[in-house]
């Protein structure tokens, strides 16, 4: 994508709903934790005379976003880093609070649509899958890891119940160097047929990508940052695309809004002892038929939003653990 093409409108999923939740105000400061092609940042900047600090660990996104920085002179700052490090950068800028944050979790359309990045099962390319284009690649991991470690990744992050079978097939097929090679091995190991409804390669690719990029750990850290920096009534809006991410976000928002629930519906609710940092979460929002017709990738998207309460942030306060849920026991 060239700098000129980057200026062309890019509409991320649930854009109207995200902007409605954020409700940008004049003079506000907003964080776009996952800049990508700049769709959310652009919409925030167009909605009101605001400032946006946008983060992306992918150097391609930062480089190609330079045209937006030029267009919105002095109002958009791009940072080549993970959104888990937002706090470090805000501290360096001496910014104490912000008016809103948006996180669009997972791989971007830009990354999927470029075969050379190795994220897609639809086009052949090198086994890469690194968002930051640094660190361990998918090729290095799959060709060197123990079979058990590969199986664990597929099971935990792809919820693949036949993960051991797939891992055995991957080890037997080494060396693997391309996305088509890997997809073929996965499909053959699970007896996939072209007319089957779901392609098992999709969630196995997802699992490997999540592992390599530490996506769930990054998500947990980013959510904690929002608690610290959002001002009273500031919005945290998070868009997720699969159940692992969504469960983490849902649990975080409920627990930090004081909704710890109860062990059984027949037992009384235990009074909440921890401070309440967020309002009661709104109902999750999903794409309507009009958006789905325009962008089929929005089908799995879920938006959750909460608003910061007046409770002061303190490092000394004990907080609920935003755990990564484990799936049921796998079969061989």
UniProtKB/Swiss-Prot annotation:
Extract one GO cellular component term from the record: cytoplasm
One of the record's GO molecular function terms? rRNA (cytosine-N4-)-methyltransferase activity
Enumerate the Gene Ontology biological process terms: rRNA base methylation
Q: Which residues bind S-adenosyl-L-methionine?
A: 38-40, 56, 83, 104, 111
User: Mostly located where?
Assistant: cytoplasm
Q: Could you tell me what reaction this enzyme catalyses?
A: cytidine(1402) in 16S rRNA + S-adenosyl-L-methionine = N(4)-methylcytidine(1402) in 16S rRNA + S-adenosyl-L-homocysteine + H(+)
Its annotated compartments are: Cytoplasm
Q: Where is this region: Disordered?
A: 309-332
List its EC numbers.
2.1.1.199
Q: Which Pfam families match?
A: Methyltransf_5
Provide the function of this protein: Specifically methylates the N4 position of cytidine in position 1402 (C1402) of 16S rRNA.
What family does the database annotate?
Belongs to the methyltransferase superfamily. RsmH family.
Question: Under what name is this protein listed?
Answer: Ribosomal RNA small subunit methyltransferase H
What species does this protein belong to? Zymomonas mobilis subsp. mobilis (strain ATCC 31821 / ZM4 / CP4)
Give the organism's phylogenetic lineage.
Bacteria, Pseudomonadati, Pseudomonadota, Alphaproteobacteria, Sphingomonadales
> What gene is this protein translated from?
rsmH
